[in-house]
Amino acid sequence: NLARLGIKPRTISKELVFCLDWLPVRGRIKEIEFNGVYVDFLKNDEFFGRKYIYSTPQGDFADNDLRFGFLSLGALEIAKALDFKPDIIHCHDWQTALLPICIKWRKHLKDDPFFKDSRVVFTIHNISYQGQYDRNVLDKFGLPEFLFTSQGLEFYGKANLLKGGIFVYPATAKEP
């Protein structure tokens, strides 16, 4: 809780609107400055105003693909809204694996000159959590069907987002 730390985020007067599953979703940019470092957050209470982050004691949220797709694509939208061209985008685990997948393959992102010089670093903290969904997740995020192969995102009949985050940049798979 930022308030307990005495940090008051400022809401930047930018509302982001972009498509998930072919429907518009909205988010607000919140920014904090702490010891000279600015951190931007994406706010959407429908996706993240919940008691639990990933799941309840009964299991995963049914919309986790959309929630973390919103986070991944929203990070790119924040960069564009603030005209911040990142040199490096550091993604962590399956929850942000859609970001490198979408930069490489999503129709309106793959040719976007805004990110042409950006590079992605992908860190895996816990390989047990892989973000596996039905193959229709490709359509939800405007990704081509040809990605659903054993050399791509397919893993035992499901789309595996963690695998996709690794496979997009083959050099990651070669690291020791």
Language model region names:
Residues 1-176:
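Catalytic cores of nucleotide-sugar-dependent glycosyltransferases that transfer UDP/GDP/TDP-activated
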